[in-house]
Amino acid sequence: MKMMDANEIISFIQKSEKKTPVKVYIKGDLKEVTFPETVQAFVNKKSGVLFGEWSEIKTILDENSKYIVDYVVENDRRNSAIPMLDLKGIKARIEPGAIIRDHVEIGDNAVIMMNATINIGAVIGEGSMIDMNAVLGGRATVGKNCHVGAGAVLAGVIEPPSAKPVIVEDDVVIGANVVVLEGVTVGKGAVVAAGAVVTEDVPPYTVVAGTPARVIKEIDEKTKAKTEIKQELRQLNPEK
């Protein structure tokens, strides 16, 4: 797994073309309208759909207003610097509504649940599950076979670039609504109880709880049984 350096992310955002992509449903005498190659136009003589940059499409609409009867614009971002990650080739289960930015690393058989938000530079290891509404900030790193509970937040670090990101090592279970602050490392096999606010490193194979989180015990067989990672939830269809 690769972690992006903060300066690489800053440079990427600085140099990226800021975009306002739109989808426009259009109706009118469209045989009279010429669409440039930079706009994807799926149209017939009377109606169609356009995909492209708003500034270009707005110019088309304004200059051809006498031919256009009506249109509806769908737009979900403005001057966006970071595109969404192309998910088609990723060998993981990613559910609807997850927001995953470009330059995120996702290991095989990971699971990203509904409405999870994964920012640029984050890394998710093989077989790890990011549950509903969880947030992984910029450069947050989750190891293999972990579970990040619903509503948990792993704080992001892009600026200042010298700051250390959150690192969650392998086989960690993080409960619902946990907050892990910048620079914290959660050690291998640890368990963070629901609702905890983690401000300091968590030793491996310990259970922490509270605000701020404190070690309450070492991992025992009872804890292992309660926090077992089920591989059945991470299985994908056989490749064809």
Swiss-Prot record:
Pathway assigned in UniProt: Amino-acid biosynthesis; L-lysine biosynthesis via DAP pathway; LL-2,6-diaminopimelate from (S)-tetrahydrodipicolinate (acetylase route): step 1/3
InterPro entries per UniProt: DapH, DapH_N, Hexapep, Hexapep_transf_CS, Trans_hexapeptide_repeat, Trimer_LpxA-like_sf
Name of the molecule in the record: 2,3,4,5-tetrahydropyridine-2,6-dicarboxylate N-acetyltransferase
EC number, UniProt record: 2.3.1.89
Family membership: Belongs to the transferase hexapeptide repeat family. DapH subfamily.
Protein's job: Catalyzes the transfer of an acetyl group from acetyl-CoA to tetrahydrodipicolinate.
GO biological process: diaminopimelate biosynthetic process; lysine biosynthetic process via diaminopimelate
SUPFAM superfamilies for the chain: Trimeric LpxA-like enzymes
Keyword entries, A-Z: Acyltransferase, Amino-acid biosynthesis, Diaminopimelate biosynthesis, Lysine biosynthesis, Repeat, Transferase
Catalytic activity: (S)-2,3,4,5-tetrahydrodipicolinate + acetyl-CoA + H2O = L-2-acetamido-6-oxoheptanedioate + CoA
Domain of life, source organism: Bacteria
Taxonomy of the source species: Bacteria, Bacillati, Bacillota, Bacilli, Bacillales
Transmembrane residue ranges: none
PROSITE patterns with a match to the protein in the record: HEXAPEP_TRANSFERASES
One Pfam family recorded for the sequence: Hexapep_2
